[in-house]
Amino acid sequence: MQLKDYVKDVLDFPKKGIVFKDISPLLADKDAFDLIIKEMAKYCQNSDYIVAADARGFIFGAAIAFHLKKPFVMVRKPKKMPGPSYSVSYELEYGHNVLELQEDLIKENASVSIVDDILATGGTLNAMIELLEKAKAKVNNIVVAIDLTKLSQDFKSSLKTPLDSVIKY
């Protein structure tokens, strides 16, 4: 099974000049979804926690955590979780965004795998690393379903954490 066959290119979405990688067909096929989760999970076996960000990261992170029987921790947009949270603001090409992590969910010095759907420029992943450093967790590795290699080169060249992907474009 070729997982790339289940990722659809959508031209000019969400705006002209963009080629959007639609993972909906991959998620809608039980065998393709099962395979990508198992492939991603191979890289997460040695971590104490699986951490993923709103929203599509949750799809992969929760499934991997369930598959490996490990705790799953959500990184969310502001004001979506109760209680004290670590917060990080980061820049996007069209503005900025904020991510939060509840303070009491990850034990100090625990090892963590960060999981996401697609790696483009790495802004979200950098913010997640910063949040986990605030929580005094050890980022063991990063695992993404899809790596857009032309867009991710700068991020990967400055990254000190191992990064693995299942599908590369």
Swiss-Prot record:
One of its GO terms (cellular component) is cytoplasm. It catalyses: AMP + diphosphate = 5-phospho-alpha-D-ribose 1-diphosphate + adenine. CDD domains: PRTases_typeI (cd06223). It is found in: Cytoplasm. Its EC number is 2.4.2.7. It comes from the Bacteria. InterPro entries: Ade_phspho_trans (IPR005764), PRibTrfase_dom (IPR000836), PRTase-like (IPR029057), UPRTase/APRTase (IPR050054). Pathway: Purine metabolism; AMP biosynthesis via salvage pathway; AMP from adenine: step 1/1. Its main location: cytoplasm. Keywords: Cytoplasm, Glycosyltransferase, Purine salvage, Transferase. GO terms for molecular function: adenine binding; adenine phosphoribosyltransferase activity; AMP binding. One of its GO terms (biological process) is purine ribonucleoside salvage. Coiled coil: none annotated. Homodimer. Belongs to the purine/pyrimidine phosphoribosyltransferase family. Catalyzes a salvage reaction resulting in the formation of AMP, that is energically less costly than de novo synthesis. PANTHER family: ADENINE PHOSPHORIBOSYLTRANSFERASE. This is Adenine phosphoribosyltransferase. It comes from Mycoplasmopsis synoviae (strain 53).
